[in-house]
Amino acid sequence: MQYIIPSNLGWLESKLYPEEIKLLWNYILEANVNAKPNLVGHLHESLYLKDKKNQFFDRTLIQYCSHYAFKFGNQGDKIPTTGQHQMCLESFWVNRMRKYDFNPFHNHFGVYSFVIWLDIPTDYREQYATTEANDGGSASNFEFMYTNILGEITTYKYQLSEESNGTILFLSLIHI
């Protein structure tokens, strides 16, 4: 008897280096262009960030793209184009959230997308304790939603707290 597990795509999870976090905080402090009209969700504030001289892209993101391509294949190869194109950072923004803010399931455009948690305003344990159903729902979670081999909707939850500071790189078309 053999067990067959079909291949599937995944995502990367990694902690940023202190100098990368410092660079992002500097970008956030300088941000002043409203991104909310182009985004979904009930969020306190969303601002576009400017990656000066592509520092964050060149130092951090391109490495994650390479690691992802090594493990799961270069997803950019699947996009029909007339020639080769360099990876670039199309848009970059910060969501400043407060207690009770939320972002509904959505997806992003492009080949790759990422999220970086820098300062989590809540703790999932506290949020779970205050839910009426107390069923460990989705309060203070970050979730991926996808279908399994049977077509059933499946989720993968990140339960967020102060310890969650880190980075995840994931495919743009996966629902979050």
Located regions from the model:
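Catalytic core of non-heme Fe(II) oxygenases with the double-stranded beta-helix
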Residues: 90-170
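Conserved small/polar residues in nucleotide/adenosyl-binding loops
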Residues: 175-176
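Non-heme Fe(II)/2-oxoglutarate
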Residues: 1-86, 91-103, 138
